[in-house]
Amino acid sequence: NINKNHSLRKLTNYLPTTGHDKLKKTTEEAIMSHPVSEKSALVVSAHSADFVWRAGGAIALHALQGYQVHVVCLSFGERGESAKLWRKGNMTEEAVKQVRREEAQAAAAILGASVEFFDIGDYPLRADKETLFRLADVYRRIQPHFVLTHSLHDPYNYDHPLASHLAQEARIIAQAEGYRPGEKIVAAPPVYCFEPHQPEQCNWKPDVLLDITAVWEKKYQAIQCMQGQEHLWEYYTRVALQRGVQAKRNIGITAARDIVHGEAFQSIFPRVTENLA
């Protein structure tokens, strides 16, 4: 109960202060109906800003619910995702990496997640067997209840699907009894692909809409940490509003729940349930 009350106190800071009393009450009731427990989640991000744009709301929301959320950034996006920094002149790759590291750490702290960096490079992102084993070891350590990563296809950025395949292959290795025998293996956490920049070209179709209204302000604060990609701030604000409208429509426009902002995900594996409601 102490943990639940602490979560609710934190939640108050994340909610808008005017015009959302009904939303606040509904969200508090939802938090109270999900007891805080030792649960965890893993986010595998190709570049150091991807987890913020595409899953920042999910991270903040589950952190509020008591999940330990851990982010793995495979690269800093130092070559292909830091144009604004390079245009300043007199920049080096190491200097760009340092800026990107600090941005991602600040964003993760706002969202309530821990973060680590594999620093395997970008444009192109490439991974050897040791990198795969390193990620499998993260799975073993975190024991995630669910995983968030990139779409399986992205013709605009080959780093993204490679990150997705790494996340899934490492999951399989972490499930194998013969990999580091004696360690606790990973179960079968569901994997959700977060929204790519241009979903129509990525064969990505959402089947999960997540209400992130209660944590939107936190997500936008995290977005603003990404100074190297300021041109994307308002784009992802529009995406969140659009997904919020769609989420509201999918629960029925007469529903009392006031959804404003949302995130969308595509599940890879079937959901196993005892209740279809």
Report the location of each language-model feature.
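Internal alpha/beta domain cores that form substrate/cofactor-binding pockets in large enzymes
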Residues: 70, 114-196, 204
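Short, solvent-exposed loop/turn segments at secondary-structure junctions
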Residues: 76-78, 153-154, 198-199, 215
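Non-transmembrane alpha-helical segments in soluble domains
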Residues: 105, 168, 220-224
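Short helix-coil transition/hinge motifs at the ends and kinks of transmembrane helices
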Residues: 85-91, 181, 251-255
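Active-site rim/loop-helix segments in enzyme catalytic domains that contact anionic ligands
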Residues: 11, 20-142, 266, 274-275
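Extreme N-terminal basic, low-complexity initiation segments
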Residues: 2-8
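The feature marks non-catalytic terminal segments
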Residues: 31-36, 186-277
